[in-house]
Amino acid sequence: MKSGISGFMQKQLSTIIFLGFFLFYLPTIVHAQAPKVTGHDIRFKVKGYKDSTAIIAHYYGDNQYIPKDTAKFDGKGNLQFKGKKELPEGVYLLVLPKNRYVEFLVGEQVQTLEFDTSDAIATMKVSVGQENQIFYSYQKTMSDKAKQAAPIKAKLGKTKNADSTATLKKELEAIDKEVKAFREKLFTDNPKTLAVKLFKAAQEPEVPEAPILSNGRKDSTFQFRYYKSHFLDNIDLGDDRMVRTPIFHGKVEQYLTKLTLQIPDSINKEADYVLKKASKSKEVFKYLVWWITNNYEKSQIMGMDAVFVHMAKNYYLNGKAFWVDSAVVNKIRDRAKILDPILIGKKAPNMFLTDSAGKLFTLDGFKAKSTILYFCDPNCGHCQKETPKLYEFYEKNKKRGIDVYAVCIDRKPDDWKKFIREKKLNWTNVWDSYTATDFKNNYDIYSTPVIYLLDANKKILAKRIGVEQLEDFYDNYFKDKIGGATRE
């Protein structure tokens, strides 16, 4: 038994709204007056339970289960959750034994709900609590009308008679018209309720036909652009309650990760747009700043550290992240300070290193169409395996203008020289003989090996790329950027 917006509503409501085949009717609701209390007092009568324990929990972002209170049945199916503190408003779950649950809304702090576990939606009775009266009446009616419309749809799928088809379509069109009218009335009459905001948030944009361009063809990108530009129209990101719903996180995540091109500039622009919409809600804003920063900091997609730096500069380091203490801000500042100079597209910091004979080789002075900047440690087991693979690639591709600037980060020259001899590394091998280079802070080297790819002007093209990825990268790079340099 699972009921509520994440169960019935997300699976059924979206289908109903998309097809527009189902009529709902919201009966006139008589609102019982809840007594004024301090804190919360939420009561359930559940048929089928006597001596068990139940929990109420709420959604938060992408986490379904944040426990808030526990109670025991009284032997007659009655539960009471009562406390001196008010519960934060949002979508809650009454979690029953055997992982069964029912969803309900906390809008009012005093509520009384009664249902049978065999079908919570059909049997739900709400005697106190406007939010849940709307929430369950809407779902029940939608469910009933879906069943009512199903035979019409089935007939339409089977009939081959043109007149019958036209008649059935008219019936569905009439239902669709009534659906829209009643839905509009519900939204108009109860605009500030969480229930209505949930129903609206579940709606998808209705995309019109693409316009015809001057060349006589349809605008092939119009529908996607329209869908994206209106995707967040119906979700109120300025309402604190939305952060405790099952719709909120998925909606924003889809917008930022599926509808937005996954390159830093695009993500940063859209993140700012979303956060501007959330600026009136401290809770939504707080969650989204945290989630966007955390999501892209952990991303395995190359270059997404630019999103972290953007979030750090524009939200954490300027005081907008009001919930973060100074210790956390300092850590974020330190991390952003390291990453900012070595983002893809920026010029790599110069280095002044020497070879085994003491000859100086600066990175800026290293001439190549593309430089493989390779950080390694002769005592690193992974370097022992990867270096021969890289050298093999280098031998095959050096005539394309690719050269290697191999940096030993270890301070023991004897181990390094032995490593060069044993691996027969006939490329530019350098180390910090002056012990003046901070590899960790200059290039974010906390483990080895690490590869950076640079263009002829030492602009960073890629970083932390595997040897096995070099072939494809350079095939595309030389084709697109240099004009098809070939292997010889």
Predicted feature residues:
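Bacterial Sec-dependent N-terminal signal peptides
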Residues: 1-44, 488
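N-proximal helix/coil linker or "cap" segments that precede and/or mark the start of modular domains
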Residues: 298-354, 359, 364-366, 395, ...
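A non-transmembrane, solvent-exposed segment enriched in polar/low-complexity residues
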Residues: 32-191, 201-202, 206-238
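Non-catalytic, surface beta->alpha helical segment in thiol-disulfide oxidoreductase systems
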Residues: 93, 447-450, 456-487
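Structured, charged N-terminal subsegments at the starts of enzyme catalytic cores
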Residues: 220-283, 289
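Short, internal strand/loop/helix patches
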Residues: 349, 420-457
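Short active-site neighborhood of thiol/selenol oxidoreductases, capturing the structured segment around
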Residues: 361-390, 403-405
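Structural microenvironment flanking redox-active thiols in thiol-disulfide oxidoreductases
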Residues: 384-421, 435-441
